């Protein structure tokens, strides 16, 4: 009497691994390939963990039910013996006809019904186990795919030692480095600026990740020349970006590094740090003429209104008149934070954009962009100009500003 229930109990235990399947449903159609995040992997792992817990709980419940049923069958077998001790034929799935003995017919009928129901449930569980197995295999393949994508993206989030290729990544894909790092200490950080990339062998201009000291990583446009690597901090070329922005925008940066943009005062300050730097200014007019200027500079922090520290010859051309221990100082000014040297006016409101205005009349490379030279002089003064080259009222066609540490002269 115990052998048949025990065999069925074994079948149920084998099939019980599919518990809670009815709540799972069919797998969702595979998503289109895309970059993954750790959150997606965590969601899948959490779902599989919950599924495993549910299966275990269902197995325990089914095991208890089978144990109770087995005990009832054993009790029935003892009660159904004839007075001489001969047992009633064993109750099986194929022998469900009630005995003609004195056993209680209601009890036997109830047990027969339960056995039929259990057999039906076992068949359903076998089917669901097979279905869930296919579902779990698909989930496993998806997790492997996501893990592969995460491994591919790891250079964007880990240090230089995990994948040095992250230092040469251009959108949307990193390029491989030209050679090994110079020393082991460089294996754990990104380059400080474009000049460090140049010193390590990079000769192609483009977009790269850098990380100045004390700053999180960010993307910059590097221009590689025979003089070394230059970090582009501003570009004007087609008027696609509005440069009449508030203080916070000029602090953090705006625009597209591949087109018109302003890198951000705080980023420039971090790149320069305490080192000596030089600023290159490239200008172009509407007749195809070009001018290039270079001069030593230092940029203070936000507590100095990101003041440019300039030497006397250059300072006079830009209108700087504030003496500091480091030289003549020219604070940055916007329409919502006025730091210019005109006490009676706000140069950023009178003109346009944010700039180291001085007395409003020397230069403004972040002014309004005109696609042709306006006729009205009052309108022209709001444009992009550099007084000592094409004059106060000539709006320029294109400008680029670049910085490089002065130590690059010795390195190059």
Curated annotation (Swiss-Prot):
Read off the Gene3D superfamilies from this record.
Gamma Fibrinogen, chain A, domain 1, Gamma-fibrinogen Carboxyl Terminal Fragment, domain 2
Q: Name one GO cellular component term.
A: collagen-containing extracellular matrix
| Cellular localization per UniProt | Secreted; Secreted, Extracellular space, Extracellular matrix
Per UniProt, residues of the Fibrinogen C-terminal domain are 185-407
Q: Which UniProt keywords apply?
A: Angiogenesis, Coiled coil, Disulfide bond, Extracellular matrix, Glycoprotein, Lipid metabolism, Secreted, Signal
Q: What subunit structure does UniProt give?
A: Homooligomer; disulfide-linked via Cys residues in the N-terminal part of the protein. The homooligomer undergoes proteolytic processing to release the ANGPTL4 C-terminal chain, which circulates as a monomer. The homooligomer unprocessed form is able to interact with the extracellular matrix.
Q: What is this protein called?
A: Angiopoietin-related protein 4
* Organism per entry: Sus scrofa (Pig)
Taxonomic placement: Eukaryota, Metazoa, Chordata, Craniata, Vertebrata
- Gene of origin? ANGPTL4
């Amino acid at each position: 009497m115990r052998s048949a229930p025990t065999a069925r109990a074994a079948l149920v235990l084998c099939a019980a691994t599919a518990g809670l399947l009815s709540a799972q449903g069919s797998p969702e159609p595979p998503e289109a390939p895309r970059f993954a995040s750790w959150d997606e992997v965590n969601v899948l792992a959490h779902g599989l963990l919950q599924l495993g817990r549910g299966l275990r709980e269902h197995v325990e419940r089914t095991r208890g039910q089978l144990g109770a049923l087995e005990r009832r069958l054993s009790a029935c077998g003892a009660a159904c013996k004839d007075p001489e001790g001969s047992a009633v034929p064993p109750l099986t799935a194929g022998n469900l006809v009630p005995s003609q003995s004195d056993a209680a017919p209601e009890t036997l009928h109830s047990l027969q019904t339960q056995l039929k129901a259990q057999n039906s449930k076992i068949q359903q569980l076998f089917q669901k186990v097979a279905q869930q197995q296919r579902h779990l295999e698909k989930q496993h393949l998806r997790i492997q795919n996501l893990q592969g994508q995460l491994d591919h993206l790891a250079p964007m989030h880990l240090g230089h030692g995990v994948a040095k290729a992250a230092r040469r990544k251009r959108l949307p894909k990193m390029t491989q480095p030209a050679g090994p790092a110079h020393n082991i200490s460089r294996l754990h950080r990104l380059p400080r600026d474009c000049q460090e990339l140049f010193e390590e062998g990079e000769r192609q201009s483009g977009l790269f990740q850098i990380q100045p000291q004390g700053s999180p990583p960010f993307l910059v446009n590097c221009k590689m020349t025979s003089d070394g690597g230059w970090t582009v901090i501003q570009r004007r070329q087609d008027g696609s970006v509005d440069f009449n922005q508030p203080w916070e925008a000029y602090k953090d940066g705006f625009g597209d590094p591949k087109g018109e943009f302003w890198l951000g005062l705080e980023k420039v300050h971090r790149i320069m740090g305490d080192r000596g730097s030089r600023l290159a200014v490239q200008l172009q007019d509407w007749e195809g003429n070009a001018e290039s200027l270079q001069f030593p500079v230092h940029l203070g922090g936000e507590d100095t209104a990101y003041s440019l520290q300039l030497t006397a010859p250059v300072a006079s051309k830009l209108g700087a008149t504030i003496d500091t221990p480091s030289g003549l100082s020219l604070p940055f000014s916007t329409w919502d934070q006025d730091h210019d040297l005109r006490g009676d006016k706000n140069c950023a409101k009178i003109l346009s954009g944010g700039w180291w205005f001085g007395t409003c009349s020397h230069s403004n490379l972040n002014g309004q962009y005109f696609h042709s030279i306006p006729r009205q002089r009052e309108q022209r003064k709001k444009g992009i100009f550099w007084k000592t080259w094409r004059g106060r009222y000539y709006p320029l066609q294109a400008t680029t500003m670049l910085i490089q540490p002065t130590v690059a002269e010795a390195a190059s």
